[in-house]
Amino acid sequence: KTFVDECHKRGIAVILDMVFNHSTGLNPMNKLYPYGDDLKYNPWFNVTAPHPDNVYEDWNHDFAPAKKMMIRALNYWLTEYKVDGFRMDLSHGLCGTTYDAMDHITDYYEKGVKAVAEDAYFILEHWGPQMSSERPKLINQGMLCWDNTTNAYYQTAMGWLKDGDSFTNANRDGYVTYCESHDEERAFFKAKQYGNGDLKTDDEERIARVPLNMAFLTLLNGPQMFYHFAEFGFDYSKYQNQYGQWGPNPYSIKD
């Protein structure tokens, strides 16, 4: 609470990353029932996720107690901690036993967010085959949707003109765009591996060019996301060890 209050004193909004799509076997709702092959006896989770890109165990949002728990969690963070909104991980997975997430997403926004905080942010990481038709509808209801423009930023970072201007939704209201995230490689790494001419071999050339991406990003309409440690010019792959982006850094920040 102190953290949120101090951020607000400085004009900084606090947005929580909420993972309502999936959970692991450590979750209490998983421990209430047999696990593994007997997951079918657990009403809180789907045996097989009805949507693409799933990880771990998939929450069954058709199960009324599960949905009630999610709504209460959103209410609680907004009223008790006064956070400014949420980024919903893998939002196209907020579905029940069939691949239809729209009604559940709308309920979470209306009952979980707007019912207690009219102006709170509700940002959806909305991928999947239905995103092209669903995202405009969600935006029209007041929500925001992720828009992945990393390839265009990669091209500019690497010094290639092809697709470097592909920012289809990047400057439109309702979309949250970004240069990098934990799901993609860092732009510095791409420039070091595949850069045009001296960009591939010359550190100074990369340092002079790649940070320009952030200038492009901040000039666009709406909110933008800055991926941690980009400010230090980290240029190693997120797969540089067995732990991926959660592994130890190959060199310390002070270096």
Regions found by a protein language model. Name each.
Residues 187-203:
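Short, basic, glycine/proline-bearing loop/turn elements
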Residues 25-32, 134-135, 188-190, 229, ...:
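Short, solvent-exposed loop/turn and secondary-structure capping segments
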Residues 8-10, 73, 79, 90-181, ...:
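Active-site-proximal helices and loops of the catalytic beta/alpha 8
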Residues 1-82, 90-101, 105-117, 121:
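Substrate-binding/active-site clefts of carbohydrate-active enzymes
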Residues 184:
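Extended, charge-rich helix/loop segments that form flexible
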Residues 59, 198-199, 251-254:
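Glycine- and acidic
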